[in-house]
A protein has these predicted regions:
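PLP-dependent amino-acid enzyme catalytic core
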Residues: 1-337
Length: 337
């Protein structure tokens, strides 16, 4: 597969270059020259395969590897991602079932499998791995049904949202993508008001993953939906600290299938004990943020299609914080996990 950058679509490079570099010579982020398309028949075939086989097929597509589902299973286990069902067709996609209790362990192992030499924020390999994992989740048609599936995630560096948007372009049944922000709500301001402060200072919260003011993969979104010229305008605002404004047409374009929600830290602290009381399910602060953002989206739009919420680490990783919120000793909390 050939790749170009978000700042130059004329000079293409090969897969080998993308595996060892996170950015091109122009400083742009790598993107495929052309995203492949999956037909309904091809998607049906994938839905009949295991999670590992789905992941292998997507990785082979982007990196010209010759992986099998067995290779992936041996690398990350047969069930590295599990779906926990809550009420109203909401599934918590736990991507952390490994010895570290974090998605980063799964990502590291898969990077080694495709011989990637970089794990820097913003590199294409990280995005492609997210796409592969999401494709594997969507392959569980017996669980998720046959229609489109909404995807909710903490906005963070925008890796999960851009991965879901790319998969939708490829023909996968991705519905709306819900980007969940906390008090660091610059992305919400962009989608809701068409403007983004590039000189904002981050606020430290109980969800560090969301404490991002300028998501690195936002450049991929602007490039894919607005082109190179729009990226240059955005970068100039970043260089000067000016506010970036979207044109009306660009704003309407971005709003198609993309929703942003703001959830305060206080609400996260309320959601964790409430969800446990209602569903006997313990959430990490990040999962509670994404779950609450999904509920906001549903309340505003009235849409109640099947949805998955990305959960990238176990509550075990935030045991002291979650225990404090639930007013439990850490030892008692761990008995609930």
């Amino acid at each position: 597969m050939l790749y170009v950058t978000t700042r130059n679509r004329l000079d293409a490079v090969t897969t080998n270059h993308v595996l060892v570099e996170s950015r091109g010579p122009d400083g742009g982020l790598f993107v495929p020259l052309n995203l492949p398309k999956f037909s309904a028949q091809e998607r049906k075939r994938l839905s009949e395969q295991s999670f590992g086989h789905c992941v292998a097929e997507i990785l082979n597509l982007f990196f010209s590897t010759k992986l099998t589902g067995w290779d992936v299973d041996f690398c990350i286990g047969r069930y590295p991602v599990r779906l926990e069902s809550l009420a109203h067709r909401i599934y918590m996609a736990e991507t952390w079932h490994n010895p570290d209790w974090r998605y980063q362990r799964l990502e590291k192992n898969l990077m080694e499998l495709v011989h990637a030499e970089t794990a820097l924020s913003g590199n294409w390999v990280s995005v492609a791995l997210r796409m592969a994992v999401l494709a594997g989740i969507l392959g569980n048609q017996g669980i998720l049904g046959t229609g489109s599936v909404d995807v909710a995630a903490v906005t963070g560096d925008f890796t999960v949202p851009i991965s879901a948007l790319y998969l939708r372009k490829m023909g996968f049944p991705v519905g709306n993508v819900i980007c969940c922000c906390n008090e660091n709500n610059q992305f919400w301001d962009l989608i809701c008001n068409g403007q983004l402060r590039t000189d904002g200072c981050g606020i430290t919260t109980i969800v560090p993953e969301a404490d991002v003011t300028l998501p690195v993969n936002l450049e991929r979104l602007i490039s894919g939906w607005g082109g190179v010229a729009e990226v240059e305008r955005y970068l100039e605002c970043c260089r000067t600290g000016a506010t970036y404004f979207l044109s009306d047409s660009m704003l309407q374009h971005l709003r198609q299938g993309l929703f942003a929600s703001v959830v305060s830290s206080a609400r996260v602290e309320t959601a964790i004990p409430n969800v446990y009381k209602t569903h006997q399910y313990v959430m990490s602060p990040a999962s509670a943020l994404a779950y609450s953002g999904l509920l906001d989206y549903r309340a505003k739009t009235g849409n109640s299609r099947t949805a998955i919420v990305f959960c990238d680490h176990s509550p075990e990783c935030d045991a002291s914080t979650v225990a404090g919120i639930m007013d439990l000793p850490v030892t008692e909390l761990k008995k609930l996990l």
